[in-house]
Every structure is written in structure tokens, then in C-alpha cells.
Amino acid sequence: MKVINFAETNSVLNQYVAEIRDVAVQGDRMRFRRNIERIGEIMAYEMSKELTYSVKQVQTPLGVAPVSTPDDEVVIATVFRAGLPLHTGFLNMFDHAGNAFVSAYRYYKDKECRTVDVHIEYIATPDLSKKTLLIVDPMLATGESMELAWKAFVTKGMPAKLQIACVIAVSYTHLTLPTTSR
């Protein structure tokens, strides 16, 4: 699995990440959501570089111009509700993309409230067969909900490609998600 850590490179993205992590700023809900959306836009742009492109001829007012455009059929997927601002940021960049959603919630498996589990409630997605699936989730803590979302999504077809975008993440996904989607 290829991991790109955008925080390792100086860019305005680091300002948005700093603000969502800053206790003095994160209480401003609108700014928090907008910063997550902005991060989504930047990540979507960077991830678009991994798509397959072909040259198309476009008629302009001055003549015909060759332009490289993506060939991939992209579907942007997220786990409801926390993922919606990041999902919106991706949609701002991939305006031809399909949408996929999975609803998941955490619950305690024991009376002492020590053991937490994740339950997938429902899934709404187009057929994912031969598509490029971008799963976007702002916070990847244990990776369990991401793993369950992946398993739920592939019941609707095996994507040709999988890319995952997380604002804050840990290394658990290296152990549970495929290095390729096949």
C-alpha cells in the first residue's frame, strides 16, 4: 500500500490541519467543517495524479486543443456523518464522480463499557465493478470502521482501484486493507 503523508511537505494544507487539531480553534464548528472540506479538495487534487488519463481533442474558440482528462470512473465513498465535509471537498474536485455511503456506529459490547465494536447499518452505492473507489474518512483511529466499510462496499462490486484519504490516520490499515483491490 502506498502511503502519502501530505504533512511531510510544506503547503497550506498544514494550516488547515493545525486549525482542526488546535483546541482553541476546533470549537468553531463552521471553520472545522470548512477546513475538512478544504483538506478534501487538496487531497483530491493530489490523488487525481494517480488516475489513468488519455488525451482528448477539445474544440476551443481558437481551434482544437489536446487535453489529458481522466478515464477512471470515480466513486467517492464515506462513512456517514463525520465524513461528509471531506466527501464534499472531494466532490468539489471530482464533479463527475458517483457517491457511495455507509452508515456505521460504535457500540459497547459489554456492560462495563470497555469493549467497543462497530456496526454497519446500511449501504448506498452504485455498482463498484471496474470503478476507482476513493474512500474518504477524516479520522482513522483503529481502522476498524474503514475495514468494515471496505467489506460492505465490495459487496456491491469489486473496484478496479482503491484509494483511501484520511486527514488523521494510523498504520492499522496496512494490516487490514489490500495493497491492490484484486
Task: Tell where the protein language model's regions lie, with residue ranges.
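PRPP-associated nucleotide enzymes
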Residues: 1-175, 182
